[in-house]
Amino acid sequence: MKKELMKKIFDDTAYVRTGGSDAEKRAAEYLRQTASDLGLEAHLEPFEVELATVEEAVLTVDGREIPCKGYLLAGSGEVEAPLYYLTESDRYSLSGCKGKIVLFDGYLGYWRYRELLENGAVGFISYDGNVNYADRDIDHRELRPHVAKGEKLLGVNINAKDAVDIVNSEAKTAKIVLKQREYKGNSHNVIIDLPGETPEQIIFTAHYDSTSLSQGAYDNMSGCVGIMAMAEYFAKNPHRYSLRFIFCGSEERGLLGSKAYCIQHEAELKDVALVINLDMIGCIMGKFISCVTAETALVNYISYLGSELGFQVKAYQDVYSSDSTPFADKGVPAVSFARAAGRDLAPIHNSYDTVAVMKMEQMQKDVDFITAFASRMANAAICPVAKEMPDNMKEKLDEYLLRKKKKA
């Protein structure tokens, strides 16, 4: 793909597109039209998602109102209680949660939320941002249904600067007022098919949604540009395997698009030889990585290919937090490619994720390497990757998908 078209796609999609929103649907239609302009046929496949519109969110700490955003899908109501700052997960620290509104560090994951519930918290406060940045942005987060499991606590998210002020002032009490409308809607996967000589498939995935503050250029319109470029390439070049390209919706809300696809197409997964996922490529700086959720032979293959083609790549075996994982959980070998820049170079999930961190020449180089790998797989007499998930990857999948708590 020419770099001018790559840049145009980034520019045309430079807006927030959260999962299930009208803006996400607009991006899905744009990807379908872009495919059509390239001579490719694409269609949208809807799946149901939980949605919410917050009508009021107020946090008061010691009588002072703190700017906040209410957690989506966390219910409605109000609660006032003593404030407690939780920094650890040992029994003593957790014992302080009972009857309190709890301020905590980091993300509200499944196990942290279980700890809050089981130890009697009555509400929660999270924070994001950086105390050294000029902005006072606040991410609009959600209490994911698979985290809450029907047990909802009122919660808000605030800026890190205000979190520091709250703790520094030794605040004693907090009050949360949250009113929202919760309902169901649709997100969409966008799918392109290129039939091959065999019905067996290689699937390419990349998510096109973003978080609430982000234009999502690096994370992850870059991956979408990548698989669109590969669809353009393979439409004009041989491939023995049939190829399917899936632009996944609502990844940032918990891999919802790829999970929905694996449910809707479960019977077809037996014919999928490999999943190739792109999530964050083409930024100006950063190391190129390949995370393999499959046998270690594929790790070695990709490392050797990098040496053969003169391309720096760090391949390793693990579970990647992206759309490759639901497929791997169904036993399909998967590999994710990314150029990992880190928060100091290309921060994600905030307003700094824009096309300014991208370089079209680097995009082309990254896509060329992934295409070279994919072409070898797509034209193999038989895809050499074993269709068997190693036991250590099954263990990691159990941990990632919250079936088992990760050992400390």
Enumerate the language-model features and the residues they cover.
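Second-shell loop/turn segments in exported
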Residues: 14-22, 41, 102-106, 151-153, ...
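Soluble metallo-hydrolase cores and metallopeptidase-like ectodomains found primarily
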Residues: 62-67, 71-85, 89-91, 139-217, ...
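N-terminal capping segment at the start of a domain
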Residues: 1-23, 38, 132-145, 209, ...
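Noncatalytic luminal/extracellular "stalk/propeptide" segments of secretory-pathway proteins
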Residues: 8-98
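His/Asp/Glu-rich mid-to-C-terminal helical/loop segments that flank catalytic regions of hydrolases
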Residues: 232, 344-408
